[in-house]
Amino acid sequence: MDAGYTNQIFGDLYNALFSPDSETNLLAPTKYPDVKEVIDEIHGAGGIAVLAHPAFLDNFDEIDDYIEMGLDGIEVWHPSATDEDIEMLGSICKKHKLLMTGGSDFHGIYGSSTVTLGTCTTPDEHLDKLMGYKAKKKRAQRKAEKEALANAAKL
């Protein structure tokens, strides 16, 4: 902006350079890792694998595949999610006993749209389930480690 090429951060120049639909974009081709590998890495690190903002990415048709791969939860509450999206995602989570999360997707004050912290959150009851799930996974991991040590000692 200081050089005079544009008068706004997210405008015509930004779209020309960074929109995937622009013929003049500077974007490098993106190579995404295998979803199953990512889920396994998350679990291996002791994490909980949650599908981020499917309403924004419109990847509802891939959710069943992700569940089979070991998905633990879905971000249900997101600024881009409509009431219908929230209802559908909630139903999927209940059917498959998945965790339900939410968040504002705040990426700083210089986003293409104004989203403030705390505008979209995980309801307390689901936050409690998330914390309980994490504790349950830790207990199961400790139990498995103790059993492995006991079995190794028998050898």
Q: What kind of region is each of these model predictions?
A:
Residues M1-V50:
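Conserved acidic, metal-coordinating active-site core of Asp-based
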